[in-house]
Amino acid sequence: HDRFGINGIVAGYIGALRKPILEEILEAASKVNALSVLIVGGAPKGQAGYTNMIKELEELAVEKGANAKFTGPLPYSMMNECYAACDILMVGHYVDKRLRDYAIPKKLLDAMAYKVPVIVGPYDARMKIVERYECGIVTEDWAKALTKLSNNKTLRKKMGENGYKAFKMNYTWEAQEQKLLQVYSD
């Protein structure tokens, strides 16, 4: 937490900054006591207006009373520090509705690898992973899920451990290699 100048329970958002989802997250975070939000990332590829968007989101955070820290884009080599600073990771949805049910965001798997419980929307691919491995909460109500996880350290730890075990068994390069070798040998 010290690395980013934040305290309390930290809910992270890591990835391309999309205003609609961040507005939802800041609104939800403002309803949860002693919660800090770490927002890591830059503008989606090819989009301008990033500086103005950050300014607007920072103003919204102040207006709503959400304790938010925007880091801007950081190098990939710092992602381990970002995940380590998070007690919870919020996995936003894709803007393109056609992708929502099929895509598994890398940040979901990264959170599992770092033992961080996740909050995801009710979209098929990510919902199946989170429910199967009990490594987070599937919801459209960010505030309710943030409250539940921020108030229950034991639950956060259990979900984080569940995610880590599932990651090690199913999603490492070694696990994928074995699956591919099995496909080719059949």
PLM regions with names:
Residues 5-20, 26-31, 37-40:
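Conserved donor-binding/catalytic core segment of Leloir-type glycosyltransferases
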Residues 13-18, 42, 72-73, 135, ...:
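Conserved donor-binding loops in enzymes that form glycosidic bonds
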Residues 18-20, 75-81, 89-109, 120-128:
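Nucleotide-sugar-dependent
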Residues 39, 92, 120, 138-139:
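Hydrophobic residues in well-ordered beta-strands that form the structural core
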Residues 41, 51-81:
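Nucleotide-activated donor-binding/catalytic signature segment of Leloir-type glycosyltransferases, i.e.
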Residues 87, 113-116:
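A short alpha->beta transition loop at the rim of the catalytic pocket in nucleotide-sugar-dependent
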Residues 132-141, 148-153:
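Conserved acidic donor-binding segment of nucleotide-sugar-dependent glycosyltransferases
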Residues 148, 155-170, 179-182:
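A short, well-ordered alpha-helix in the C-terminal region of glycosyltransferases
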